[in-house]
Amino acid sequence: MPSLLITALFLNVIIYVINTVGAATVDGLLWLLYIQLPTGTSQIAREQRHMKREVVQLKHEMSSTSSQDEFAKWAKLRRRHDKALEAYEAKNNELTQSKSTFDITIKIARWAATSGLMLFLQFWYSKTPIFTLPPGWIPWQVQWVLSFPRAPMGTVSIQIWSGACATVVALVGDAMKASLAYVSKPKIDRIKLGATMEGKEGKKRQ
């Protein structure tokens, strides 16, 4: 069943990427994308940013105004600042509540679309072979393991295929990370060496 074979592989790749990047990072990126959409939450986010800039500006004006020499102006700025700060905190709390709801929703959706879907496929297609092995190719004991738990004898079950995909994806991913680290390390070493040489030359000039 090629479509099921590819689906299981694709899901394992997605799960590995999410685990490597970090679920919190993925959620943060999705939140940034979400508040760019034309929704009520994006309107709240824009208002919150505008209020924050206003509070910072008023605070800067207060700092540059003497409370002794220009008390009337300073007091007026203080009242405006306090009022703007109160409005900002209320809007920020509203945005925080929206983000909490979004985080819960996205966690459920992410699990359902990855691990939840994988569990469903393993249950629903437990009797469906991913592919059939050539007759007599391997001993029957190995065939039994590959068909575990409910696939026909002489085939590979989705559980075994999914486990194999997860292992291979993890190995390939770790190899890629190690290769990138190895390639980038000489550059970092050259930068450190250059900084050390410049420091030594500077000391010699002194």
From Swiss-Prot:
Major localization class: endoplasmic reticulum
Recorded topology in the membrane: Multi-pass membrane protein
Lumenal side: 1-4, 132-155
UniProt feature coiled coil, ranges: 75-100
Record field: transmembrane: 5-24, 111-131, 156-172
An annotated GO BP: tail-anchored membrane protein insertion into ER membrane
Signal peptide extent: none
MF (Gene Ontology): protein-membrane adaptor activity
Gene3D superfamilies: Helix hairpin bin (1.10.287.660)
Localization of this protein: Endoplasmic reticulum membrane
One CC-aspect GO term: endoplasmic reticulum membrane
The entry's keywords: Coiled coil, Endoplasmic reticulum, Membrane, Transmembrane, Transmembrane helix, Transport
Cytoplasmic side: 25-110, 173-206
Subunit (UniProt): Interacts with GET3.
Membership in a protein family: Belongs to the WRB/GET1 family.
Record function comment: Required for the post-translational delivery of tail-anchored (TA) proteins to the endoplasmic reticulum. Acts as a membrane receptor for soluble GET3, which recognizes and selectively binds the transmembrane domain of TA proteins in the cytosol.
Protein name: Protein GET1
Organism, as annotated: Ajellomyces capsulatus (strain H143)
Gene for this chain: GET1
